[in-house]
Design a protein with these regions (language model features):
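Short amphipathic alpha-helix with an adjacent loop that forms part of the alpha/beta core around
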Residues: 19-21, 72-79
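N-terminal leader/targeting and pre-domain segments
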Residues: 1-28, 108-123
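Short pre-active-site segment immediately N-terminal to redox-active cysteine/selenocysteine motifs
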Residues: 33-36, 83
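Thiol-based oxidoreductase modules, predominantly thioredoxin-like and allied folds used
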Residues: 8-13, 32, 44-72
Length: 123
């Protein structure tokens, strides 16, 4: 990351995630993926670029579903996620599991449009 921004890489539980939403400085961006996921690898560079371009009031999280299984399994159960990769965005004040914005899949054109939209909202 060129910005020196630190990236959250794991949540011990879904409760730890909710705790983060409570102190959200502006936006929380969470990408769920896995080392073994081909589509996740396909968009890896684009996601890193997106994270590096996010302003300081955006907390970025790159979460491996195998390392934070409690949160991912809960998101699947609540139908917030149905596969990986998925990127979800929560706005300050939203302390629920339902994200304000999300992008599912590895289509680079669609992801680039999502990134443009999010960066304009983050300003």
């Amino acid at each position: 990351m060129s910005s020196g921004k630190s990236i959250v890489t794991e949540f011990e539980s879904r409760h730890a995630f909710l705790d983060l939403l409570k102190v959200n400085p502006g936006f929380v961006v969470v990408k769920f993926g896995a080392d073994w996921c081909g589509p996740c690898k396909k968009i890896h560079d684009e996601v890193n670029d997106f994270f590096s371009r996010c302003p300081q009031h955006v907390i970025c999280c790159d979460i491996d579903v195998d390392d934070s299984f409690d949160l991912y399994a809960f998101m699947k159960k609540k139908k917030m996620a149905n596969g990986i990769p998925v990127i979800m965005v929560w706005k300050k004040g939203n302390e629920e599991y339902i994200p304000d914005h999300s992008y599912i899949g590895s289509d680079k054109d669609g992801l680039n449009e999502f990134v443009k939209l999010m960066l304009s909202i983050f300003e």
